[in-house]
């Protein structure tokens, strides 16, 4: 019946002076409950955690799946449907009536996520407007997301499996690609390959950016055809076991130009310097600045233009981030990307991205694909 994440949740709630927690972010709900294969993007689910009970409020479409997933857990499923705010207000009144709590304002603190929509917050206010017992709403800052930043072994195993698919897809796509293909043709083959290899879905919409398009870090694949001398940036990932992978490789069509080789070497050096230095206690800001320093030393100061990396998990972008703004020390169990890049508008772009986990004495890289410049 144990749920270690639920126990951690309650410990953190107590430490922050929060009695109940109203959780609507679907990735947070998935993480807290540890239910697999149940939740989708529908806004049909609420996890409501109190000091002694934990509920999932959903509707009839998810009743059977939630019932199966909750067996041998402490979660109570209520698939009655309806508005989450009204349901919580009713439960709240029943709890405090049974406990003999004196009627009044702010009888306890109810944590709400900083990502909750204003519309739903107004619904909560209305639901409690005439109630005999009213909570004090306590807005939190990444309350569950910060807990999600430290991964357990089951999560790490899922991400290693997702990355194995991604590595295999890269091995295939470099054999498939040829001069004259469009970016969209390469993208379709890449994504179909990940699915054929066992991906449950894509971690995100894949990037295939050739030639000058590669200078836009989030370029959208189009009808541009691969040309001799092009650098081609490919950023892609699979989803397996409910978790994401993320990698980027930049390859060259035909013989690489001297500039392409110079850029690639600088980006590779930055990537490998950071991966060698990551360990507990070092900050995301320090890792970002290290990459910037390596690029600057190679003549590409100010040519990255984005943060060095981000957390990965249920979502493709999680905490912690490797950015100049993050002075929080890294912890064992943090999973992050390392993705330095150089972008020269009108010419080329290059990015090299791995991801892995912070360990007791360093950084375990999940990505196994080569760091050598691959020639198509």
For each predicted feature, which ranges?
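Active-site neighborhoods and metal-handling regions in enzymes and metal-associated proteins
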Residues: 1-376
């Amino acid at each position: 019946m144990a749920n270690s994440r639920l126990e951690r949740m309650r410990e953190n709630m107590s430490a922050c002076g929060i009695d109940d927690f109203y959780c609507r972010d679907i990735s947070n709900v998935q993480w807290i409950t540890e239910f697999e294969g149940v939740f989708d993007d529908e806004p049909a689910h609420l996890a409501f955690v109190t000091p002694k009970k934990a509920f999932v409020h959903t509707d009839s479409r998810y009743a059977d799946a939630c019932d199966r997933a909750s067996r041998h857990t402490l979660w109570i499923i209520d698939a009655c449907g309806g508005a989450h705010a009204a349901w919580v207000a009713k439960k709240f009144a029943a709890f405090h009536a049974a406990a003999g709590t004196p009627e009044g304002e702010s009888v306890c603190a109810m944590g709400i996520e900083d990502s909750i929509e204003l519309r739903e917050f107004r619904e909560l206010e209305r639901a409690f407007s005439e109630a005999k017992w009213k909570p004090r709403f306590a807005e939190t800052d990444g309350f569950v997301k910060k807990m999600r930043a430290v991964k357990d072994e089951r999560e790490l195993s899922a991400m290693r499996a997702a990355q194995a698919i991604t590595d295999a897809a890269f091995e295939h796509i470099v054999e498939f690609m040829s001069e004259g293909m469009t970016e969209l043709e390469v993208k379709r083959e890449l994504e179909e390959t990940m699915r054929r290899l066992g991906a449950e879905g894509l971690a995100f919409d894949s990037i295939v950016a050739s030639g000058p398009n590669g200078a836009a870090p989030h370029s959208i694949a189009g009808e541009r055809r691969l040309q001799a001398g092009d650098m081609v940036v490919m950023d892609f990932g699979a989803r397996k076991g409910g978790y994401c992978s993320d990698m980027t490789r930049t390859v060259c069509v035909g013989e690489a130009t001297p500039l392409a080789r110079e850029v690639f070497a600088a980006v590779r050096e930055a990537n490998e310097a950071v991966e060698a230095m990551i360990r507990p206690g070092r900050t995301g800001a320090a890792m970002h600045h290290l990459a910037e320093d390596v690029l600057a030393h190679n003549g590409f100061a100010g040519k990255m233009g984005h943060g060095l990396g981000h957390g990965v998990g249920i979502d493709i972008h999680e905490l912690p981030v490797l950015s100049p703004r993050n002075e929080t020390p890294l912890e064992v169990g943090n999973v992050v990307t390392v993705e330095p890049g150089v972008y020269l508008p009108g010419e080329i772009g290059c990015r090299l991205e791995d991801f892995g986990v912070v360990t007791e004495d360093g950084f375990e890289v999940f990505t196994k694909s080569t760091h050598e410049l691959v020639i198509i």
